[in-house]
């Protein structure tokens, strides 16, 4: 036991340093820890800098590099944001076979000439899904679950469903497709027989949403205004929110999403979608357990049948909306704008439609035989596709292409679409010619290649290669059905002095969202009797 002095303190207490000495010691230790922290952080930053400096880099020429002492890509991106098309055409007119790089809104991307499309089209080391979902959207943040579902499907659930069900049932879904179009066109374009202006894109987006929903989700949801509102708006809303979050450093984005009203609204859209979709699935699962369960033939049933792991049904349906509605709408808008600028093509189109329908009735064979309509749509897509560069991919490992172009792991690549307007490939390439592909299909060697749904390095409207749009056959039929009704039941024209101005930012190219057409309903129904609504109903019930 320690000895105790007269004051009552153990003698060892006097051996402790004075308070001032103790505080000095503590301060010195804190200074030491702070210095070590600074040294450690400097070491980490220096290590990352050395790692970045020494890592392999893409070797294609960079057209809009950062300037000296620039620490962000903001200026470089703004420099090219609205001039990407011209930059691509200028570069490839000088160097037709030489890749180049730009700093775009999603970072650096190497853009290849169309001549290299065949080399990369089926390369498994290049991921379309990771480039189009994980790189562009924030799949771990609430509200972006549809892109998370899409990111699972490099060659999985969604692709299987589209290939094995949607494409194989095209003939069976043609009648309900036409039935819904008959009703929807009347609702959205109206019955006014006087000339009146129609905001083209704002009218066609809900129209396409409703018609697509009829096939994907059935009759009930295609008339549900809440679902139509969510499906039509989610694509543009998610893109805006994704752009907003990209302004923040990655570690802060989740926190920002919790505080941002825009992010909360996006998450609410997904919750509302689940509130509509999940009860339908639950009811079907109950019916399935009964002896006389109802049979369904829509994408809800298809996904349930092919899902091998847990998935989010509502988010999957929203992802389908993202990849289908706005691209289909864009093609429709462009075709209507082009036809209104070339009214001489209208009567031949109407004649073809009437004659084919009288001969074949209402089926996919009839749509296939409408070669002039197919040609008109493909020509509009040729002159204004939805992107200046397509075949977006992200490298899963370091890749060196045949010409020596190096693509490091994690780098994005794409292929320029300028060949679609190349005078060396197309006669009068800059002019719209509705008969261009019609004439090509008269030559047996080009019968397949000249169809709207066909792709090649010279026409990549639906992409190209292993990741070509799997829903392009349905999209082509859907656009044709809508065009049939608009051509036979309505007249339209471009208002005097009006000229649509497509929007271009980075590699995206969209039709003018403010453009209006003048439209009027024809006085008499110009559609053959077998296409009446009553006929549809009888066919659907039989």
From Swiss-Prot:
Major location (coarse): membrane
Top EC category: oxidoreductase
Membrane topology: Single-pass membrane protein
Induction of expression: Expression is positively regulated by the TRI6 and TRI10 core trichothecenes biosynthesis gene cluster transcription factor.
Superkingdom, natural source: Eukaryota
InterPro entries to which the protein is assigned, alphabetical: Cyt_P450, Cyt_P450_CS, Cyt_P450_E_grp-IV, Cyt_P450_sf
Disulfide bonds: none
Sequence positions that bind heme: 469
Positions bearing carbohydrate: 167, 297, 428
Pathway terms, separated by semicolons: Sesquiterpene biosynthesis; trichothecene biosynthesis
Localization of this protein: Membrane
GO MF annotations, alphabetized: heme binding; iron ion binding; monooxygenase activity; oxidoreductase activity, acting on paired donors, with incorporation or reduction of molecular oxygen
Gene Ontology cellular component annotations, sorted alphabetically: membrane
Any one of the GO BP annotations: secondary metabolic process
Keywords, alphabetical: Glycoprotein, Heme, Iron, Membrane, Metal-binding, Monooxygenase, Oxidoreductase, Transmembrane, Transmembrane helix
Transmembrane regions: 37-54
Miscellaneous: Trichothecenes are sesquiterpenoid toxins that act by inhibiting protein biosynthesis.
PANTHER family named in the record: CYTOCHROME P450, CYTOCHROME P450 MONOOXYGENASE AUSG-RELATED
Function field: The biosynthesis of trichothecenes begins with the cyclization of farnesyl diphosphate to trichodiene and is catalyzed by the trichodiene synthase TRI5. Trichodiene undergoes a series of oxygenations catalyzed by the cytochrome P450 monooxygenase TRI4.
Family: Belongs to the cytochrome P450 family.
Protein name, entry field: Cytochrome P450 monooxygenase TRI1
